[in-house]
Amino acid sequence: MKIIEVDEELYQFIASHTQSIGESASDILRRLLNLPTSSVSSVALETVAVESAEAANPETPSAVKNDFVLEPVAEKSSLEKTVKKQPEQVICHIVNKVRQVIESEAFQHETKAVVRFLAILTALYRTNPEGFSLAIESEQVQGRTRVYFARDEATLLAAGTHTKPKQIPDTPYWVITNNNSGRKMIMLEGVMHGMQLPDELIEDIRGYFIVN
């Protein structure tokens, strides 16, 4: 394992260019430097120290220096799992239910990103439990070196006592909540893509978590 220390400005710069959960440090830097994709195993970028400022207010970036761990990870298999295509009526049902949630008066007046985050996750699970379960267990959502969802609090606490796990209401799942609004949106996007939901819905939800 290799450890590097970066200052806050560099941390925020790298984090702002993350395009998916579990994206490797090599992937990010190669994209920023316009280098060709490497054919060798990459290393995953993982935060190992959650700063006191972010722990106190997870909706905003911290203002202290950050540490990253670079851990070697195995190359992805060239054989991707076959994803069962969801019937159109199932997708439409999920979209309608999620829109009911985000267009509700309670959601519109909610100011805490974590409450909105949990409300959307609950809606996704209740409309399609099987699809939700498959989506959150995928590498795209869980990442290569960090667990974001689990069936119990202990599993998430084992990954770090700072993760602030919360149970997703009316579901058997728990999720970490110590991240900022942008990271919450990346997690939601991964789940919704895994459930084969349309980009239009994802973009509408993005507006509640990321201000351009």
Curated annotation (Swiss-Prot):
Keywords from the named record: Cytoplasm, DNA replication inhibitor, DNA-binding
Region (Interaction with DNA): 113-114, 144-148
Protein name: Negative modulator of initiation of replication
Subunit (UniProt): Homodimer. Polymerizes to form helical filaments.
GO molecular function: DNA binding
Main location: cytoplasm
Function according to Swiss-Prot or TrEMBL: Negative regulator of replication initiation, which contributes to regulation of DNA replication and ensures that replication initiation occurs exactly once per chromosome per cell cycle. Binds to pairs of hemimethylated GATC sequences in the oriC region, thus preventing assembly of replication proteins and re-initiation at newly replicated origins. Repression is relieved when the region becomes fully methylated.
Similarity comment: Belongs to the SeqA family.
Superkingdom as given in the UniProt entry: Bacteria
NCBIfam families: PRK11187.1
GO cellular component, one term: cytoplasm
One matching Pfam family: SeqA_N
GO biological process, one term: negative regulation of DNA-templated DNA replication initiation
Annotated HAMAP family: SeqA
Compartment(s): Cytoplasm
UniProt gene name: seqA
